[in-house]
Swiss-Prot record:
<comment type="subunit">
    <text>Homodimer.</text>
</comment>
<dbReference type="Pfam" id="PF00709">
    <property type="entry name" value="Adenylsucc_synt"/>
</dbReference>
<feature type="binding site" description="in other chain">
    <location>
        <begin position="39"/>
        <end position="42"/>
    </location>
    <ligand>
        <name>IMP</name>
    </ligand>
</feature>
<feature type="binding site">
    <location>
        <position position="144"/>
    </location>
    <ligand>
        <name>IMP</name>
    </ligand>
</feature>
<dbReference type="GO" id="GO:0046040">
    <property type="term" value="P:IMP metabolic process"/>
</dbReference>
<dbReference type="InterPro" id="IPR018220">
    <property type="entry name" value="Adenylosuccin_syn_GTP-bd"/>
</dbReference>
<keyword id="KW-0436">Ligase</keyword>
<feature type="binding site" description="in other chain">
    <location>
        <position position="225"/>
    </location>
    <ligand>
        <name>IMP</name>
    </ligand>
</feature>
<keyword id="KW-0342">GTP-binding</keyword>
<feature type="active site" description="Proton donor">
    <location>
        <position position="42"/>
    </location>
</feature>
<keyword id="KW-0479">Metal-binding</keyword>
<dbReference type="InterPro" id="IPR042110">
    <property type="entry name" value="Adenylosuccinate_synth_dom2"/>
</dbReference>
<feature type="binding site">
    <location>
        <begin position="414"/>
        <end position="416"/>
    </location>
    <ligand>
        <name>GTP</name>
    </ligand>
</feature>
<feature type="binding site">
    <location>
        <position position="14"/>
    </location>
    <ligand>
        <name>Mg(2+)</name>
    </ligand>
</feature>
<feature type="binding site" description="in other chain">
    <location>
        <position position="130"/>
    </location>
    <ligand>
        <name>IMP</name>
    </ligand>
</feature>
<dbReference type="GO" id="GO:0005525">
    <property type="term" value="F:GTP binding"/>
</dbReference>
<protein>
    <recommendedName>
        <fullName>Adenylosuccinate synthetase</fullName>
        <ecNumber>6.3.4.4</ecNumber>
    </recommendedName>
</protein>
Length: 431
């Protein structure tokens, strides 16, 4: 009987999901993206060779795996075709192994323009978006005026819808932001041409998923960004525009929640965040710089440096609860190698006393101070270890302490970027 596993980030993104998805795909028939867009960034290292993916599921590097993009993903045709061509240039077959939901909203040129204009207008109060049109595309989806991939199947109707929505966007650009209008005719022709390449890959992804389920195949659902960036449950308004938590799996793919068997939460051994927003354990000293340099903390999608801090057990307990996490994969343990001591945030100090759950709303974070537990570090290297018995005793103690604090088992430990640099204590697919 097949198992259906969700892999998602439990911090603010960049937890190392791509490697773990790639690691687990040797067991699956299909890998599915269910939310976000090309604002995601997954770097895979296979036998020393790096591959960066933003939209196509990480399973594409496994030749027998079907890759699916669900209806919850907002689709940039340009980004999709660029990624397809780059993979093909490296000898990876894509077009016969990738299926994209006909219900995917399309990201238009004007979505990108509006996204970037808004960020400029916010000045110092910017959200920190990637500027790729993700948010405006989701807005149009919710407002029921967006165009979807399936609309390209009817060119006449598509033109009517596109002219209507881009006229509205141009009004916003010219009248509110005082910027130049976008050429609708040029956008229409460009989308028609790209549609000719993309439509052969379009399909009813929900139906395909349930066919795999009925055949008893393993399916893996690949989350993007991180749980603390969820539009509803994250540090609003410094969040992304989609549901990055486990609930988004069902709505973004049409695969009912009762069919999901295991939720794997990916978590760094410390904490990072890109862009603006609350970050209670952020370090502004040499230790923060050390983590950033040793962890190579630069965003795959944006190229921006990530903010770094100690492990936040308070935030992680929240993420585990809202996702019904079955087990944790701890990544980048090796970044902590060589430190005399390591710290874990176990609570937040507020003017009204200590709390052990994150507050709701960003304003409540302004008076928060982290409460730390300090543990002894380890001088030995953990890089490339494949057995828990090989770990230094203090590293084992650190892992046990984290499990106690977050109230969840650590089932996988990543000890390096390559798929083979992994310690598996309990396999999500039970194998």
């Amino acid at each position: 009987m097949g198992k259906n596993v969700v892999v998602l980030g439990t911090q603010w993104g960049d937890e190392g999901k791509g490697k773990i998805v790639d690691l687990l795909t040797d067991k699956v028939a299909a890998v599915v993206r269910f939310q976000g867009g090309h604002n995601a960034g997954h770097t895979l290292v296979i036998e020393g060779k790096k591959t960066a993916l933003h939209l196509i599921p990480s399973g594409i590097l496994r030749q027998d795996v079907q890759c699916l993009i669900g209806n919850g993903v907002v689709l940039s045709p340009e980004a999709l075709l660029k990624e397809v061509r780059e993979l093909e240039a490296n000898g990876v077959a894509v077009r016969d192994r990738l299926k994209i939901s006909l219900a995917c909203p399309i990201i238009l040129r004007t979505h990108v323009r509006i996204d970037q204009a808004r960020e400029r207008a916010r000045g110092n109060d910017k959200i920190g978006t990637t500027g790729r049109g993700i948010g405006p595309a989701y807005e149009d989806k919710v407002s029921r005026r967006g165009v979807r991939l399936g609309d390209l199947c009817n060119p006449a109707d598509f033109e009517i819808k596109l002219r209507e929505i881009m006229s509205y966007h141009n009004f916003v650009l010219t009248e509110y932001f005082k910027e130049e209008a976008e050429d609708i005719d040029a956008a229409l022709e460009e989308l028609r041409q790209m549609g000719e390449e993309i439509l052969p890959m379009a399909a009813d992804v929900t139906d395909i998923l349930h066919d795999y389920r009925k055949r008893g195949e393993h399916i893996l659902f690949e989350g993007a960004q991180g749980s603390l960036l969820d539009i509803d449950l994250g540090t609003y308004p410094y969040v992304t525009s989609s549901n990055t938590t486990a609930g988004g799996t069902a709505t973004g793919s049409g695969f009912g929640p009762l069919y999901l068997d295991y939720v794997l939460g990916i978590t760094k051994a410390y904490t990072t965040r890109v862009g603006s927003g609350p970050f209670p354990t952020e370090l502004f000293d040499d230790m923060g710089k050390h983590l950033a340099v040793k962890g190579n903390e630069v965003g795959t999608t944006t190229g921006r440096s990530r903010r770094c801090g100690w492990f936040d057990a308070v935030a992680l307990r929240h993420a585990i609860q809202i996702n019904s996490v079955s087990g944790i994969c701890l990544t980048k343990l090796d970044v902590l190698d060589g430190l005399e001591t390591v710290k874990v945030c176990i609570g937040y100090k507020t003017p009204n006393g200590e709390i052990t759950r994150p507050p709701i709303g960003c304003d409540s974070y302004s008076d928060i101070e982290p409460v730390y537990e300090e543990l002894p570090g380890w001088s030995e290297s953990t890089v490339g270890l494949t057995s828990v018995d090989q770990l230094p005793e203090n590293a084992k103690a650190y892992i046990r302490f984290l499990e106690e604090q977050i109230e969840a088992p650590i089932d996988i430990i990543s000890t390096g970027p390559d798929r083979v640099e992994t310690i598996t204590l309990r396999h999500p697919f039970g194998e």
